[in-house]
Amino acid sequence: MLVRQPSFSLSAHDELYDILIPKDNFLRQMKELVDFSFIEEELKDKYCLDNGRNAEPPVRMFKYLLLKQIYNLSDADLVERSRYDLSFKYFLDLAPEDSVIHSSSLTKFRKLRLQDKDLMDLLVEKTVALALEHGVLKSNTIIVDATHTTSRFQAKTAKEYVQEKSKLLRKTVYKYQASIKEKFPSKPTTGSLEDELAYTNAIIDVIEKEEQLEQLPAVKEKINMVKEIIDDIEEEANYGGDPDARKGYKSTDYSFLGYKTHIAMADERIITAAVVTSGEKSDTKYLKKLVETSEKNGMMVDTVIGDTAYSSKDNLKYMKESEKKLISRLHPIITNGKRERGKEFEFNKDANMYVCPAGHLAIKKLVKKRKDSSKNPQLKYFFDVEKCKVCPLRDGCYKEGAKTKSYSVSIKSSEHLAQEAFQETEEFKRLAKERYKIEAKNSELKHRHGYEKANSSGLFGMKIQGAATIFVTNM
């Protein structure tokens, strides 16, 4: 049953908070700045309102998740720290003497209460509203980009991942007590996941019997992290790693297995919209959603800055129709074509035809329309194939036995022509220099907030991680 969380405590020990938690403490500042009651309103349909045992207040459970994300803790370590860290208890609206939840409650909260909830939009909307209310957000410009997060398992199987974490646990233990190696069971040789899990559990049992060793913070953290991974794996039937992670590419020679977060950020470095997808999704298709979500959240957008991925024909049309400026350079293939240097066909303006590298003039031309309406039509120029057969430059140009030889050139759309002219203006060049800000934000997300790697498997878990991370980053 849903119980409303009291907004104040009647404990005789509350004055400890004023003495020990400074005014500039991050958790104190967040608690005083944000009214988290919107979480209860959003999740109340997931609770029975008048029957059953009293549930832990949803606002407090959500705050536990924020703490987990801020401090990169396992569920068990989070609960343990919440017992004695007064800044945690203050943030959670607990009295100093109050007890804390069991770590299993966090798993239930994630799976039972947060399913079917768009936590990302809810939290981003809240932080944007706060920024507007406090006069932090004043610009009408957003910068768009996508940042990648590797899967928790990357390209490893669940067995390989357990082996890796088990090895890290053993290495940590050996630093304090190398002789314990004699007490560990033999490593499994069958190659099965079940045997690897049994072996790792046996190692944990041995360590936990050594009380002085088990209580060391470095060892305890590793044990709790391995236990959480094992629990995740055992809960999944037919577990096979991360089912939603997909391969994406950062360059031709660098791929990753995981997820993408498509981000819109205001000029003041407040994230105004975000969408989490699997790793293979194209950046191009999310510009419209990022703009519309930013506006729904309270932004007045008139300029969008992005890299070449966003200058597609559809995006240019959308920006023109919505009377917004797109600061995104056209891909070089559109502006310059994609022919190799030294193999270019040159246009003869007098003959209104192309001339091949051997100096032969095209004999006719046709307009070729594309089946995909988002692609520009082409002009196809035809050459005298009899000349091609005996041409000294035919290797790599004319295919032996072909009945025709043609050269195609895409006709630039009116959108591309307008953007090509716009990107040469001083205004475009000045605004394009602001794109570095979102690269810096991506770096902050990854290196300061642990967004480089997913901390759970599945798209649902990634969305929760993304929502909590961006909420904290915006604060």
Which role fits each region the language model picked out?
Residues 87-105:
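Short, positively charged loop/turn segments that connect secondary-structure elements
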Residues 74-77, 82, 98-99, 107-475:
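Anion-binding and metal-coordination hotspots
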Residues 49-56, 65-74, 94-97, 111-118:
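Short coil/turn segments at secondary-structure boundaries
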Residues 1-34, 394-417:
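Charged, often Cys/His-bearing segments associated with DNA-binding zinc-finger transcription factors
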Residues 58-69, 84-88, 261-262, 289-292:
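Contiguous, well-ordered alpha-helical segments that form the cores/surfaces of helical PPI scaffolds
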Residues 62-65, 104-108:
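Positions in alpha-helical segments
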Residues 26-66, 70:
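Basic, short loop/linker segments at the boundary and entry of helix-turn-helix/winged-helix-like folds
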